[in-house]
Amino acid sequence: MSGLDRESTRRSAKAGDLTLNYYEAGDPTPLGGGLPLVMLHGGGPGASAWSNFGSALPGFAEDFRTILIDQPGFGQSDKPPVVGNYFRFAAEAVKDLLDELAIDRIHLLGNSLGGGTAARFALLYPERVGRLVLMGPGGLNLSLFHADPTEGVKRLMDFGAAPSKEALRAFISTMVVNQDLVTDELVEERFADATAPGAQEAMLSMGMSFWNPDSYEDGLLWRDAHQLKRPTLLTWGREDRVNPLDGAFVALKMIPKASLHVFPNCGHWAQIEAAEEFRQVCTAYLARHVERTKETP
């Protein structure tokens, strides 16, 4: 689907007490039962729905009504202090937005931080989710062999401590294998968003929700993975330096209806670095997935 740009697809709506920004394109088709596809971005500096998924929107909009949401604290959405753990806070905001848009059920795709939000949403509101696609998801990744924090998280913390374009470039470099994707234009765009009014305070509030003793354990989604009843596709870049591949195995074991697809020569941004393969894999899963249990061959 051509002719889609940031401004022509941009919308906003109330989500409880918040106003959330989102981008929408495409119409329902028989694929995936006609359910809308909602995408939730990651949580790095300057992250937004458009920066993560804008380039993927035309392809997915061919087959789905596709909605890219700026999560609370990111992009053009409101940036309130986080109450409790961010995954739950954002999942409830997504639910409020869907209520406002009169959308009952969705397929849900989340990247990194957005994967954690998507998983929490599916735990809270399983009846509203068709299928899940979780890309190197936060909260579910439990590294078996890599040190924690990982290289990517360390670079994220470096930027938070002393924001600069150099620190941001170092962080973005951990996102991808192909360093040609780390352009000056990308760094400038992400830095502008990361240092916009309220952005750094929102990032700090989000981050602290995973360290605060009162909300920390609510973010350990791997503990609840066995309760994720919806069909779930886990996707991972083999060279992911933020949430490394060994973090997939506990989730793969624990989620009852989980599958795993690994993109070779790919980092944390499969939707960008393996764009066409990512679209094909996700579309095939959402369109033709057949549920199979231990009792059925």
Residue ranges, per PLM feature:
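Conserved HGGG/HGGXW glycine-rich cap/lid loop of the alpha/beta-hydrolase fold
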Residues: 18-76
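Active-site loop/oxyanion-hole signature of alpha/beta-hydrolase fold enzymes
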Residues: 23, 57-58, 68-109, 280-283
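Gly/Ala-rich beta-loop-alpha elbow adjacent to hydrolase catalytic centers
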Residues: 110, 114, 118
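Flexible "cap/lid" loop of the alpha/beta hydrolase fold
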Residues: 119, 123, 130-164
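Conserved alpha/beta-hydrolase catalytic His-Asp/Glu region
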Residues: 163-226
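Short beta-strand/loop motif that positions the catalytic acidic residue
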Residues: 228, 234-236
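Acidic catalytic loop of the alpha/beta-hydrolase fold
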Residues: 239-243
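Catalytic active-site module of serine/aspartate enzymes centered on a nucleophile-bearing elbow/loop
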Residues: 258-297
